Amino acid sequence: YYEDWKHVVFQGKVAKVLNKYVVLDQTAFYPTSGGQLHDIGFIEGMYGKDEVVDIFKQGSVIVHVLKETPTCKVGEDVKGFIDFTRRKQLAQHHSATHIVGAAARIVLGEHINQASAKKTVEKAHIDLTHYDMISEEKLKEIEDKANWLIQQKVPIQLKFYPRTEAEQTFGMGIYQGGAVPGKELRIVNITGYDVQCCGGTHLLNTGDAEAIKILKANKVQDGIVRVTFVAGDAARAQQKGEQNVLEETAKLLQCKKTQVPARAQELFELWKQAVKKKKQPTSLELKATEEFLGSEKDMLVKVCEIYKTTPEHIVKTTERFLSELKETHESEKK
């Protein structure tokens, strides 16, 4: 996996078996490390197929954790199969972490460094060194610049260097997120934009990240801002989810998607007047037709501001406002 994230089928020999733990003489399974989750998959031998549910590193030894008691025996030749979809998503999130960091440096300044990071299948985050909270406008600029870097299909060079040579060639900025042990360092170089030592599974060019969508930013401590994002398939799923939220809300408000923010504002004002202030409006009909000119993400942000909620609660909040408004109106008529 150091050279090619697509290396998901390999052959090896069983070196040790202890309960559900198996060690092979060589493996392509990635262990949880560097803020990145482990691979999963199967080890297949002459006696059956064993499901691998966890991978960890004990010293220099990579240990495979099986779901059940292993069928493989010490000395047996086996074949390993790694879950390709999971590996791809984790590689996309890991390389996207470097891409987002590079984009943030372009937008916010050269003081930006990675303090730490985490990459899971569902999402990833990068903790950036920055003196202030990042505004929504700057987040949008960072997202746009990250996707621009994807469109450029910048080569990502993965190479091991002796520590001294790496430091002399690339400078001490390679140590982002803390010092790395060992006489040799694996350098991940997004040519011209970001260089750091890293041991994770990485793409071979930025284009393979496909898309990056920033979800939020929050301050975790003084001088550290956490940016949470998704990439690749996870980014497309997030975008699809946002589209579904807007479509469902538009149906509830009986309007076009672009009119949702205006209708949501109108509904909120009616609800506040009737339910909170106990003043019944003359009509419950929503008439606002003003069209929102921003992106779907900006539309969701606007509706969240109006409702004072989060995107996943927009539909339920709309349903609640409509229901409570109707109930209050009907009780007043009685």
Regions inferred by a protein language model and the residue ranges of each:
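Generic, well-ordered alpha-helical scaffold segments in large soluble proteins
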Residues: 13, 17, 43, 99-107, ...
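Non-catalytic interaction/regulatory segments
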Residues: 121-221, 270-273
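A generic structural motif
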Residues: 84-88, 130-134, 218, 231-235
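Extended active-site and interfacial segments that coordinate phosphate-rich ligands
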Residues: 29-63, 95, 99, 201-218, ...
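Ordered, soluble secondary-structure elements with a strong preference for glycine-centered loop motifs
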Residues: 31-38, 90-95, 132-140, 199, ...
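Terminal appendage regions of diverse proteins
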Residues: 111, 121, 207-210, 215-334
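Conserved nucleotide-binding/hydrolysis modules and their immediate coupling elements
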Residues: 1-81, 85
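Active/ligand-binding-proximal structured segments within catalytic/core domains
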Residues: 28-43, 73-128, 222-224
